[in-house]
């Protein structure tokens, strides 16, 4: 298994155009933090802020996945857009790209909730299964990718499981930072009122009612 090179992380620029210096809010508490621990937390916060603005670098450093130029462009442009539509050729890797983006956002943003919707529950579960295989390093064509860092952040609520739930209500997982991902089925009446980011896989085949409820 290829391990993440810590030298790459240490060589990150100290300041980035999207960072605001060292203006990090420190919540006052009953037990004051030592200056050494506070300095360590600030380094982590600056690292998080840098990667939030550079998702392609994050995917390369933490998942060891080198995207194609077109894929990297899609990730960078779609990263902070409220609505994104991808129209790509067959074999572009749309579903895999979606999964990589979900994994990156789950790790970089706290309480990031994502729902995967498709025309049928099985199709959404297939997209989820690809994400699960990425986390378990079970995709032969992506030689050298490392999903162990992402998998280590998944909450394991059942001692006999690995954190990935395959319930009849939808496949799901949650991270320690509060991020959550779940698949949706075609029963739209049970999904009204849910809040979060929705990913439509093969959205061209969804009916109007499903699009209006999920969106």
Labelled PLM ranges:
Residues 2-215:
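Phosphate/NTP-binding elements of NTP-utilizing enzymes
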């Amino acid at each position: 298994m290829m391990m993440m090179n810590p030298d790459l992380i240490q060589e990150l620029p100290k300041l980035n155009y999207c960072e605001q210096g060292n203006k990090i809010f420190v919540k006052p508490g009953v037990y004051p933090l030592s200056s050494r621990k506070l300095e360590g937390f600030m380094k982590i916060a600056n690292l998080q802020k840098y990667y939030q603005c550079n998702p392609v670098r994050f995917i390369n450093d933490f998942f060891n996945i080198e995207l194609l130029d077109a894929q990297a462009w899609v990730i960078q442009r779609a990263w902070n857009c409220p609505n994104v539509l991808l129209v790509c050729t067959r074999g572009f890797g749309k579903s895999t790209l979606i999964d990589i983006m979900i994994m990156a956002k789950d790790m970089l943003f706290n309480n990031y909730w994502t729902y995967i919707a498709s025309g049928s529950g099985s199709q959404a579960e297939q997209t989820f299964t690809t994400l699960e295989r990425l986390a378990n390093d079970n995709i032969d064509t992506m030689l050298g990718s490392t999903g162990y860092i992402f998998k280590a952040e998944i909450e394991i609520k059942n001692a006999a499981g690995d954190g990935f739930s395959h319930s009849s209500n939808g496949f799901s997982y949650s991270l320690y930072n509060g991020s959550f991902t779940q698949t949706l089925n075609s029963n739209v009446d049970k999904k009204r009122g849910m809040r979060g980011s929705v990913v439509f896989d093969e959205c061209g085949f969804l009916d109007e009612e499903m699009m209006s409820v999920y969106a």
